[in-house]
């Protein structure tokens, strides 16, 4: 890591021995270990240990779960919130497990589209609901800081499975719950 940063500092014309930079490689390594800890965790294990047999057959919604991730194209952050709705079949998930699932996938190099899809697919595979929907809204610093430089753009992505994909009324109910 130190060699990487020595080369980086040299390439941008910075003095690697400057007081403020002396411990930067170590600090960045610690930060990266935290930001990308999702590679060391299995999202399926997180869900498998957090569900229980349920009696609810109505829609359950977890709304505005904050996240941040890193764009794999420019290594800049993107951040926002994710809302997940599902209609149980037999399993109900602990609400904190939804946040954990989002955290595991977001703490990896990502693109928003894949993040949204991975959350929906893993949830669908492990919980086996009658339907699941994931809506992700995010701001991308790669879009704000370089290129088109649009600071207020919000990107929205969705992934739908089961009843949410097949039934427009189910989708509409979810969207109405998000508004209320």
Swiss-Prot record:
UniProt-listed GO biological process terms: one-carbon metabolic process; tetrahydrobiopterin biosynthetic process; tetrahydrofolate biosynthetic process
Cellular component, GO annotation: cytoplasm
Pathway the protein contributes to: Cofactor biosynthesis; 7,8-dihydroneopterin triphosphate biosynthesis; 7,8-dihydroneopterin triphosphate from GTP: step 1/1
Protein residues bound to Zn(2+): 71, 74, 142
Top EC category: hydrolase
Keywords for this protein: GTP-binding, Hydrolase, Metal-binding, Nucleotide-binding, One-carbon metabolism, Zinc
Gene Ontology molecular function: GTP binding; GTP cyclohydrolase I activity; zinc ion binding
PROSITE patterns assigned to the protein according to its UniProt record, in alphabetical order: GTP_CYCLOHYDROL_1_2 (PS00860)
Catalyzed reaction equations: GTP + H2O = 7,8-dihydroneopterin 3'-triphosphate + formate + H(+)
Entry EC no(s): 3.5.4.16
SUPFAM superfamilies: Tetrahydrobiopterin biosynthesis enzymes-like
Pfam families per record: GTP_cyclohydroI
Gene3D superfamilies the record matches: 1.10.286.10, 3.30.1130.10
PANTHER family tied to this protein: GTP CYCLOHYDROLASE 1, GTP CYCLOHYDROLASE I
Family as reported in the entry's similarity comment: Belongs to the GTP cyclohydrolase I family.
Name this polypeptide is given: GTP cyclohydrolase 1
Native source organism of the sequence: Helicobacter acinonychis (strain Sheeba)
Taxonomic path: Bacteria, Pseudomonadati, Campylobacterota, Epsilonproteobacteria, Campylobacterales
Gene from which the chain derives: folE
